[in-house]
């Protein structure tokens, strides 16, 4: 019986194929290489045990702070900046003061804008950070992110989107607000949606978009043991072009509280006919600032009901249904502050009455920023064909 089985052509082909697979496995270096073939590429090797200071190499940047604008006709910046250092140190203590952050970033212009002086940047990237009552986290992010991005030789601007009031936090809706307001300023090439408590650990993780589809950038967080928690995870830090953002109708507006919106967004990407790309695990390293659970950002009890409806609701819930009241647009020395009233959860309890800003929260922080603000210089209005993204609020 065994002999007849071995004489069958399909059995012989199976045996030959198995032998070839084993030979390939051994020639490529065993399990690690095989996993790189059939899993996700681990990418180049970096030594994270000897990180560089995040302010390394900034002295090599051309151009003096406050000098004349760069002349026209500059060559394009290199595709990969020669100023990159790889792994950088991330420290959560002490929390730097605003004065220290401003002093260490003299090339940053009002509104948190930067443009390299010696070459024409290949990408104009808007960093959009949803925020409420996380001042220490915000200072750590600003201290860390400005030099990180300057070494990449990008033109960039940082937008911090404050949710006014005491209602339930809505991260995804704040990101929609940030995208719309950022595109009123400039025709950005790339939109980086960035949680305030995540600090990048490797400047080879370029803050640029992929024209082929949305990028999920925070692929290896210390919170998850520097690995992706599950294949469709799209949380933390992501990057989309304005066209990609509009194609998926932006982010959902109905997720009040913690959880669910990341999975909804990943589903939108698929339903819009796009695919998620990621940097190698060895590059997309992030450290999360430790914090307790936020009051007003409790677990969303409706998230699973909303996820079930995503396939039918994504074309109606997003940028085309976004409503909010813009309360403030302020140019600080380190970022553009956008304060918006985005309403309250229609399914939850009514928000308690009180000041628009939680006690001890962003109001004092913002006032300190404004006291240090240089004279405001309004940016040019975009003439890009993103009318739907820049529509009225």
UniProtKB/Swiss-Prot annotation:
Tissues where this protein is expressed: Found in various tissues. Highest expression in placenta, prostate, testis, ovary, intestine and muscle, and in fetal brain.
GO MF terms held by the record: beta-N-acetylglucosaminylglycopeptide beta-1,4-galactosyltransferase activity; galactosyltransferase activity; metal ion binding; N-acetyllactosamine synthase activity
Residues the entry annotates as binding UDP-alpha-D-galactose: 130-134, 169-171, 196-197, 226, 258, 291-293
InterPro entries per the UniProt record, alphabetical: Galactosyl_T (IPR003859), Galactosyl_T_C (IPR027791), Galactosyl_T_N (IPR027995), Nucleotide-diphossugar_trans (IPR029044)
Binding site for N-acetyl-D-glucosamine: 260-263, 303
Function, as annotated: Responsible for the synthesis of complex-type N-linked oligosaccharides in many glycoproteins as well as the carbohydrate moieties of glycolipids.
Name the record gives this protein: Beta-1,4-galactosyltransferase 3
Species this protein is from: Homo sapiens (Human)
